[in-house]
Amino acid sequence: MNNSTRLISLFSPHPPPLFLLRGLYISRIANLRRFHRRAFPPSSVASTNLCSFRPLVSLPPLIPTFPIGRFYNHQVRVSAADFVPSYHNQQLPEWTELLQSLSKAGYFSDSGSISGLESEFFPGFPDELLRPALACLALARERPELLEMLSRRDVEVLVENGKPFLFKTGPDSLKRMSLYLRSGLQGIGKLMDMEKASTVDLMRLILSYVVDVASSEESKQHNKEIMESSVRSLLSQIAKMSLRPPESNVHDTMQNQYSDRDGQGVRSFQNNVEMKRGDWICSRCSGMNFARNVKCFQCDEARPKRQLTGSEWECPQCDFYNYGRNVACLRCDCKRPRDSSLNSANSDYSSDPELERRLVENEKKAQRWLSKVAQGGSDANSVDTDEDFPEIMPLRKGVNRYVVSTRKPPLERRLANTENRVATDGNSKRSDDNALGSKTTRSLNEILGSSSSLTSRSDDKNVSSRRFESSQGINTDFVPFVPLPSDMFAKKPKEETQIGLIDNIQVDGFSGGNQNVYQEDKSDANHSGKETDRLEKEDHKSEEPARWFKRVTELHNVSDLESAIPQEISPEKMPMRKGENRFVVSRKKDRSLTSPAYKRPEDSDFVPFVPFPPDYFAKEKQPKESIDTLPAPATENVSQVVQQEPREPSINKSDTVAVKIRNGKSLEGSLVKESDLLDMSEEAKAERWFKRVAEIKNISELSEIPDEDFPSIMPMRKGVNRFVVSKRKTPLERRLTSQRHQRNPHITNSDPTGKGDK
């Protein structure tokens, strides 16, 4: 049949030129736009500038597929099964992909699915676009669930910027889509069937945008890039979903699962789909999600809250379902929120009628209690009875939430009642005496000027003592709690004053007032005497440093200050003077039993350390030796005078060392012992080292000291840095130095003044 078709096309007359078809296509699109602008307001028009158009698809492949008999003298009948679209669009490659997917799914070959849809378009719709548009609308009618499965963000961009100008019911579709986006998830179930948006409404917007982009060279929209990316994303998603089998039954059942008004219980939406415990259905796209999903995997909708029953609670961190007895989450160890515990408690006790009755009674008691307290003062115990006192303390504005009841327990209230009865009986018998005594004490207090605070304290103590006496009379085993006085652990003057006050309280009449005054005078005298003694001691201590400084200035030239200054004048703590060091060590002798002098035995071999004399190492007092030197020529300048090195024969070197040792300053009369040459201790080495260093005149003589006498640790001397680095050469260096010295002996001047012999 293909061969016959080719032969017929060869013998048939040629079709009209391409520009004629393009002109016809452009004229029809322009007529549709003009009709759309006249029928609807200008705001619903997608694009007003239609100066130039471009064909949506390549026209030659569409020529043999549509009824275009008006362009041919002979009609060619091509079956629908042989139709294979080959559309190419450079701007929207996803549109070509969608048409190929529809062709594979059989929407172009099924004429029954697209029949009756031609009436949706405006009259004069191009025949070249009719069949692809009908195939897209057929897909939208068969797959109504695609609207919920597409990206909501892309749909919002298309609805805000797109205009369905190709269809008669375009404004209605745009209205339904806008209402769908505004209503959200909660308003979908409340809308009527006529107001609900469908996939067909979305497809009308997509087709109008595709035709608009293909027919205009340059789009005048300000958000062209956002609009194009959203439409391409929607076309790609629809092309992929069109190849999948339809799931209309699943969609219908999932739409009905939330038909209950309260939303309790989940019905089985499909018999062949098994849902496990914890799985949930998305209320937006009706997609089934696993229990671990926090949001829907299709539309990114948040997981709905569970309908909790009883004391169960949901973890706020990991959304894990916990029982009421769980204090912490079993999955993430998160602590149970406080709101859930309150809700569970309210749900448990809300059905108890007895509890409700008691709460109502407590509220009434609380109102009566508050009114009585406001009228009777702050003493609630005397105002209220047990019947009027509320079980739960009411909360008032500005009061702490957790109020602790100050109400006494029943036992204490009974004891207080018996005390009051005993007190009233005693007061009736002694009313006259008490009245007379109170008048006398008031008059004395006014005369003597005693403070009212002491009287109030005495009254409180008398009342407490009466209560304790009455309680002891009722119960012999009762031991009252007597608090300690506030000044019990204070100083003695205060204790004596308190004793005087207590004696004054116990004695009635004028004699008690006189005794109180006497005790106060006595305590004041004792306090003033002790204060005087303390001031004298402080003055004596402050005078000691002054006397010590005066004595030191008088004995400024005395070398031994410790023996010259008596012990009584020397203070225990050295005073501080301006400009001196803060940490001053006292010169006072330590005569305690723990001193080192006391611990040292008398028959020990202790040898005290005696420092060298200050002029022991002075070179000026050393005996001068005659050294032969060559005088410099007198005609030369002073700057050109070069002192010749002294010439000393190497044979007399040992004799010179012996003379130095014999002529050295004697230490006779000091406590320094003669060192033992066989002693290899560090102290002996240090002692021998100091002796030899004092005798050395030339640095080259250090090599003559044997290694045994050289100390491993350099000794410390006064005025020398603590961290002394040894300048001793290694044995190899000493050998090299000695050979070099033998070849070319180096003689230096040992005279410290540099004047030489005169």
Swiss-Prot record:
Calcium recorded as keyword: no
Stored InterPro entries: Znf_RanBP2, Znf_RanBP2_sf
Sequence repeats: 368-415, 547-596, 688-736
Alphabetic keyword roster: Chloroplast, Metal-binding, mRNA processing, Plastid, Repeat, Transit peptide, Zinc, Zinc-finger
Pfam families, alphabetized: Zn_ribbon_RanBP (PF00641)
Reported consequences of knocking out the gene: Defects result in variegated plants that have leaves consisting of normal green and also white or yellow sectors in which chloroplast development is retarded or disrupted. Mutant plants exhibit severe editing defects in chloroplastic transcripts.
Superkingdom: Eukaryota
Function summary: Probable component of some protein complex required for chloroplast and palisade cell development. Involved in C-to-U editing of chloroplastic RNA. Controls a large number of chloroplastic editing sites. Binds the editing recognition trans-factors PCMP-H51/CRR28 and PCMP-H12/OTP82.
Subunit structure: Interacts in vitro with the chloroplast-located protein CCD4/NCED4. Homodimer. Interacts with ORRM1. Interacts with PCMP-H51/CRR28 and PCMP-H12/OTP82. Interacts with ORRM6.
Protein name: Zinc finger protein VAR3, chloroplastic
UniProt organism field: Arabidopsis thaliana
